[in-house]
Each structure stands twice: as structure tokens, then as C-alpha cells.
């Protein structure tokens, strides 16, 4: 059964990643109304008779979301049953399921009633939490923490501050990026790093949205760089923290490069999807570091208790 659960965890993680990228594809191609205002049917039909490209994209996104719902539910039930001895399993299972249902309902509401861009931008963030929760469940199932000896990990307050702070802030950056997509502001500023050669500062809403995201992205790049330097200096003996921050910096660098290329490639579809891919992976890595941070407190208490008993 454990072999089956491992395969299920991998497939579920990939399916949720496809859901995330599919949502970005729907937004990028303007396919949100590809099935009209009907849900769960498509243009009032179980199998649509007229298959435009927008309809195919929207219908494919709905199908992958539906399959993800089934897979996540099954994974939550099995992990709850067979891995309940792991402290985080129940919490992650609940988060995976609840946020997947929330994003599905929000997606359906957007189709039927429509939503403002500021509300639609939350949709991607909700999906991201479900994805990260499933990734963490997968790590627990594959016992990644044991392989890196994470159960004995103890971090200082400074490192935990950076882990929690960067993760929370990254969610804000994700929201600003999703808002750029939903406000159709990807090309509002044709130059980089300033808005344009003639107008370095933004003058209207779409430009403010775009520049706000750029500033937020620059700050998270600098923050992760600083945290990585701390990890390299002080956590070489803790490979999970050491490599966690190095991988985070690689991902945020790729994210930044692709973000610039989005501007200079006229917001090409490939760059837009890569932009969503890298931030999804980055958020998952940061969430894993958060899980390690919560364990660190427990590990420190256990170490202190053991030390007292020894004395």
C-alpha cells in the first residue's frame, strides 16, 4: 500500500501543478468564458458541440481540476490512515483538501457571476496553498526529512524569522503577480527596470500595478539572497536548510529572469507559464522550510529536556 501511496502522491502533485499552470493559461489566453457562464456544464452541454480553442483550454482546465479533486481526496484519506504518526500529516491533509475545494468554488463563481480582477487574483494564491500542502505531504510520505536528518534540526530565532517572513511576503508577491495578469497589465510598462524611457514613473492604474509587482519582486530577491548568505555561513552542517535556501535563490533568480523576459518577449505564452511554474516551486520550497521551522521549536524543547535529564 505504501508503494501505491507514493505513486499517488507524485501523480497528485503533478496534477495540481498542471492545474496551476492551466489556470495561468486560461487567464493568459482569455479563455475564462470558453464554456460560457455555465458550470459544471460547458455552454450548457456535457460535451460541447462547438470546440473553439478557448473552449478546449477552459474545458481541459476544468477536467484537470476535477481529477485533482479526486486524487487529493484519495491522498488525504490514505495519508491520514497510514501516516497519522507523522505530526504534520493531518494538518497538511486538511489544508490540501480545503483549499482545493475553495479554489474550485471560486473558479465556478468567477465563471457564473464574474469577479473583479482584485478578487480573481486570490484564486491563484488559494490553488498555490493546496499545491504546496500536497508537495509537503509527498515529502513526508517519501521521508525526505529523515534522509536529511531534519528531525534533529534546531534553528535560531533569526533564521526562523527569515523563513516565516519570506514565506508570508512571497504570498503577497504572488498576489501582486496574479493581479498583473488579471488586470491585463503585463505590458503596461514596456521597459525595465523603469516603466518606460519617456515616463520612468507610472501615471495610470495598470502601470502602478506592474511597477508595484516589480518592486515587490526585487525586495523578495534581495531578502532570499540575504537569507541564503546566512544559511551558507551558519548552516553548512544542516544540509536541509543550507540547500533549501540555495534552491530558493536559484528559483527566485529564474523567476526574476523570466519576469524580465515576459516584458521583452511581448508577454509570450511560454514565459508567462514559466513565470507561474517557478513561483509555484519556490513557494513549495519555502513552505517546506516553514515546516522545518515549526519542528525546530519542538526539537529544541526535546533537546533541553534530554539535557536536564542527563544532568
From Swiss-Prot:
**Would I find Hydrolase among this entry's keywords?**
no
Q: Name one GO molecular function term.
A: oxidoreductase activity, acting on NAD(P)H, heme protein as acceptor
Cofactor entry: heme b
Main location as per UniProt? membrane
Name the enzyme's class: oxidoreductase
**What residues does heme o bind to?**
61, 123
EC?
1.17.99.9
List the coiled-coil residues. none
- The SS bond pairs are 35-42, 189-195
Name the chain's protein: Heme A synthase
